[in-house]
Amino acid sequence: MTMNLSFELPFPPSVNTYYRSSFRSRSVYLSKKGREFHQLALVGLMELSDAGTSDTLHPSFPTERLRIHIELIPGDRRSFDIDNRVKAILDVLEGHLFVNDSQIDELEVIRKPMDKGKARCRVTISEIKEQSNS
């Protein structure tokens, strides 16, 4: 049986505002927007948890090859590059719903029509079954 998991997350920040760097310590860290997105997204992911009361999520797809479908639904008419939003989504899912983003073989990102004031993204993760080459 192929496992599918669908859920919504807050609209992710652009990768341009997701990270900040410290020239003094030469390190890269999550920006305030990045941390806020992670916190809100993890609250939503905890609701998906089988345990419900657990403080941690265990990957639902520990070793499977994955297909990820992302629908970006903006809350206003401002333009944005869809590829700048994917990194934040995959980062928050990695370690919580799958072990590593190297498991992803197919990634589809679609811009949906604006839903005024209700920016969000829909994510569907599907297991890819091995196909025989007969």
What are these regions (language model features)?
Residues 1-134:
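Acidic, proline/glycine-enriched N-terminal capping motif
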